[in-house]
């Protein structure tokens, strides 16, 4: 049985003759977002906003009819964009999973299950991009833009920073990220 980085002998026909080749075998890491049930989920909690990577496991948390609940946009982003539009695909699409109620985020209309397009003008390709976009921003407000033309939300940066630890404590979240 072939293992990662080993070679497998194969015979193919080219120009009417047999040709023997050795093909390298490797683990395909490109589909890791489609199923990773054996590791704890990644998340980032900020001002009551809970962000997580888009994955098949995340979508299956929507229930038995998760593919219908998720909608075509999220399914396309997870399963198809990397093949149809590789230049626009993201290494680790990030979702706003839910919003934990607190006065700092009370005016937000978008409450979760949406793809994050950019934060503070920076395109979000991974959880690391998201965290960096929040932590490096020095403006008075955070601007979070969502995919599928869902619009944007704003958070007062100072109020969000001040409320973050209280929100984590209220909801029993020990770490702001995992």
Question: What are these language model-derived features?
Answer:
Residues 1-178:
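C-terminal recognition in membrane/secretory proteostasis and scaffolding
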């Amino acid at each position: 049985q072939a293992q990662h980085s080993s070679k497998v002998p194969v015979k193919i026909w080219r120009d009417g003759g047999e040709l023997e080749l050795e093909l390298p075998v490797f683990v395909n890491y490109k589909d890791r977002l489609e199923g990773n049930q054996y590791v704890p989920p990644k998340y980032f909690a900020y001002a009551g906003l809970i962000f997580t990577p888009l994955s098949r496991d995340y979508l299956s948390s929507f229930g038995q009819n998760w593919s219908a609940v998720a909608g075509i946009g999220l399914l396309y982003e997870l399963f198809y964009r990397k093949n149809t539009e590789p230049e626009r695909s993201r290494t680790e699409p990030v979702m706003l999973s839910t919003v934990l109620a607190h006065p700092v985020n009370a005016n937000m209309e978008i409450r979760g299950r949406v793809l994050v397009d950019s934060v503070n003008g920076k395109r979000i390709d991974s959880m690391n991009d998201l965290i960096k976009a929040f932590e490096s921003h020095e403006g008075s407000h955070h601007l979070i833009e969502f995919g599928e033309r869902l619009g944007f939300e704003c958070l007062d940066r100072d109020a969000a920073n001040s409320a973050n630890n209280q929100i984590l404590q209220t909801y029993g979240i020990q770490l702001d990220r995992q």
